[in-house]
Amino acid sequence: MNMKKLFLLNLPYLLFVYPFDKLAQAFRLAPGADLSGKLLSIGDGFTAARSSPWLSFHPTDLLIGIAGAVVLRMAVYLKGKNAKKYRHGIEYGSARWGTAADIAPYMDKDFFQNIPMTQTERITMASRPKQPKYARNKNILVIGGSGSGKTRFFCKPSLLQAHSSYVCTDPKGTLLPEIGTFLERKKYRIKCLNLINFRKSMRYNPLAYIRSEKDILKLVNALIMNTKGEGEKSSEDFWVKAERLYYSALIGYIWYEATEEEKNFITLLDLINASEAREDDETYQSPVDLLFSQLEEREPDHFAVKQYRKFKMAAGKTLKSILISCGARLAPFDIKELRDLMEYDELELDTLGDSKTALFVILSDTDSTFNFVAALMYSQLFNLLCDKADDFYGGRLPVHVRLILDEFANIGQIPNFDKLIATIRSREISASIILQSQSQLKTIYKDAADTIVGNCDSTLFLGGKEKSTLKEISELLGKETIDLYNQSENRGSQVSHGLSYQKLGKELMTQDELAVMDGGKCIFMLRGVRPFLSDKYDLTRHPNYRYTADADPKNVFDMERYMKKQRAVVKPTDTFDVYEINATT
């Protein structure tokens, strides 16, 4: 404790020096030779002491005045130290519902610079508010059972704000037609990866985003992680590690040696199909073996050569098994439409933070066969945006990128997502994880699920009945203190009545109350703020609602028409073959 604070704390007690000083002066001036005589004539002493309003500076009077003030200060200190600690009205808990005053510091005055959470609560997009204590990350956990309105009450209002770039999972393929016209009106670049109808999708080539050898390893890791069979063990065995070496070698060869037109998954599949190993002839060389032999002669320390050399350490029978495993893993790519989808790239993932862009990822909510493509894309997207922010923009993207991950459990596993969600905030990237129940997250990310939830400062519960989710929400809401009134009656030879009052702790909302919560209500929790029980956001009251297909069917967005129009526009980076024709007359 500093001296200034100590002085201010004891200053009031200096005022008591005066009465104790005057008391000592009155006793000293009272007539009488002994104690009894002075006490009998103490009135005369007070009269003499009051004759002068000033403090008596007689050493005895001054000493007694100071001593009296010190004794009083010590008495107050000892009483406070030994006092019982009461928390009146909050003995069993202080939980309560939040008010407008609680959320006010976290909202921006400009409505469109917020993320709508409920009808009355929203959070600002400003990552660095004037008062740092009000800073919260924009990672949001949205939980709602089937039919609770996750798309209508959260996704659509977020997109209609149009303050960021958006990457939005669209499980049913309905969000883009309903919101696309509005985004086009706002001059957004619109991208679409459609894994239900490939013909309505823009092209996506994962190899187009490889910038270094570490990107090759990241791509291979994401590919293997999201193409596991349902019965496959989570820990890698020998075969998976061998596959990893082979994929790394082939992709490394393509990236370094192939032409720009050949840097795609089609070339990778062609190389795998051209690979062969014979059990009875260890010296046999397939066309792929010959390619790597030629490369090794030129560059013995080539990245691809090192990976391939390790792969070829296996015997012929083992190599054949590995190649079969590779073919089985990439079997979905035998579909021509999927191969065409990944022939070249139109998504331009690394530019999402440069200007306002909306990327819709349309997934099937009934079949997860091609969901690994989305997981590959998201894995690359996080790394690309973080690298772009660090290398070109001093650590922060000029346009905030919001990932609205509807049906997050259907996307697949994004490698190191628990680490990414903890670091993307500073790069102006945020993720909204939308689930039907919290157990879905634990199924995919196991122990890392708690880390992911812990890095979401906001939680929006739209309703549900899954038991573990209800238990967790109820515990987070906390307990309030309530008054209990008991009335008793005893009947015997005489009738007696009794009354008793006591306090108890009760959950702000119990699990059964959460399970039967009004369908129009939701619970919003923000770190460091009391929870809010509010109405779900009314989409029809949004200022931009009139531009959606919900308001007017004429606003339905046609992605095929949009893609044709975009492909007809010549870009500065497009290359052409120029032929000179000499016309003779």
Residue spans of the language-model regions?
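Basic- and hydrophobic-enriched, low-structure N-terminal and domain-boundary segments
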Residues: M1-S148, R152-C155, K479, N490-R491, ...
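A short glycine-/small-residue-rich loop at the edge of a beta-strand within enzyme catalytic domains
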Residues: P105-Y106, F372, F408, G464
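Conserved long hydrophobic alpha-helices within structured protein cores
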Residues: F111-M117, F372-Q380, I473
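Conserved ATP-driven motor cores of ASCE-family P-loop NTPases powering translocation/secretion/packaging/pilus
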Residues: I421-I523
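P-loop NTPase motor domains
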Residues: P19-D21, Q25, R136-I429, I444, ...
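Low-complexity, polar-biased intrinsically disordered regions enriched in Pro/Ser/Thr/Gly
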Residues: I123-M125, P129, K228-F238, E260, ...
